UniProtKB/Swiss-Prot annotation:
The keyword Signal applies. This is DAN domain family member 5. GO terms for biological process: animal organ development; negative regulation of activin receptor signaling pathway; regionalization. It is found in: Secreted.
């Protein structure tokens, strides 16, 4: 009975000895290096099962690892002809977009832009209200020449740009006015400090601050 069991275990013992041969200290170190080397390629060894470190598979493992390449760019999977057709198609799409929305260049010289001038000039402003005494207030007004343009084919629904000499820096104050019967009225006035050419895209008009204001420019 014991001989029968020993005979049945003999093939299994031979297979184990062939798969895992005896190693000395140097051999055990090289075997550990082989195991660590196999762990550095988890994706390449995942489909080969648990017998990847057996001596039967060690010779082919290096070839499989060298042929295993990670592809991140989908163009690398295309052949040369398919890649060429894709590049031609992308170039045609870019040209079509440039034709439908081309850049417009206006031939405007630097000398024409330099002729645009806008200044803040001093004057004496008379601020008054009905039944009140007027007050003379030093102020400034904008005067100059600003370049404007009109481009045909402007998109419908959009106003044409209009350039004007307008205040770029100003502040508003409340000015007291002495009125009849000893009453005191307050009038809001805009004090202009600096002016420059600005472009507007609407036709809104700016009404003067205060009804019945008078302007006396300084000569």
């Amino acid at each position: 009975m014991l001989l029968f069991r020993a005979a049945s275990l003999l093939p299994l013992l031979c297979f184990t000895v062939g798969a895992f041969p005896f190693m000395d200290e140097e051999g055990s170190g090289s075997f550990a290096q082989e195991v660590l080397h196999s762990r550095s390629y988890p994706l390449a060894n995942a489909h080969r099962g648990p017998f990847v470190d057996l001596p039967l598979f060690r010779q082919n493992r290096r070839k499989i690892s060298q042929n295993f390449i990670l592809h991140s760019d989908p163009r690398e999977h295309m052949d040369e002809e398919a890649l060429r057709r894709k590049l031609v198609w992308e170039s045609a799409i870019r040209r079509e977009k440039m034709r439908s929305h081309p850049d417009q260049v206006l031939p405007i010289g630097q000398d024409a832009l330099k002729r645009s001038r806008c200044h803040a000039l001093p004057f004496i402003q008379n601020v008054f209200r009905k039944n009140c005494f007027p007050v003379r207030l030093p102020n400034k007004f904008c005067f100059g020449q600003c370049n404007s343009f009109y481009v045909p084919g402007w998109p419908a629904g959009l106003s044409q740009p209009c350039t004007s000499c307008a205040p770029s820096r100003s502040r508003r104050i409340s000015l007291p006015l002495r009125c009849r019967a000893g009453h005191l009225a307050w009038q809001e006035v805009e004090l202009v400090e600096e002016c420059e050419c600005e472009t507007r895209y609407d036709r809104n008009t700016v009404e003067p601050a205060g009804s019945g204001e008078g302007f006396l420019p300084v000569s």
